[in-house]
Amino acid sequence: MVGKYKVVTLCGSTRFKDQFMEAQKRLTLEGCIVISVGLFGHAGDSEVWEGMDEGTLTRTKEMLDDMHKRKIDMADEIFVINVGGYIGSSTRSEIEYAQRTGKTVRYLE
């Protein structure tokens, strides 16, 4: 909590950009401080990835994965964007991390 506001980190496949944005708006209006992804690798931001050599791409993805774990550290809970029940390996890893660190886990579906 920050003051009276719960801090929520959004997790899920970045292919669900629209659902991320909807959840962010809804949770904000419910009085939550929302932490989200910085880039949508599967649903946009192609200009970031185009032209990156394989080594840079790998290091960037590893950095983003680690940064998202730090975002989970800052949160009271995570909210999983699991459209159609889909949870990929990265999201599953984030859920397991959140559970190990005592965070509440909620799901869109």
Give, region by region, the residue ranges found by the protein language model:
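Conserved catalytic or regulatory cores that recognize and/or transform ribose-phosphate-containing ligands
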Residues: M1-E109
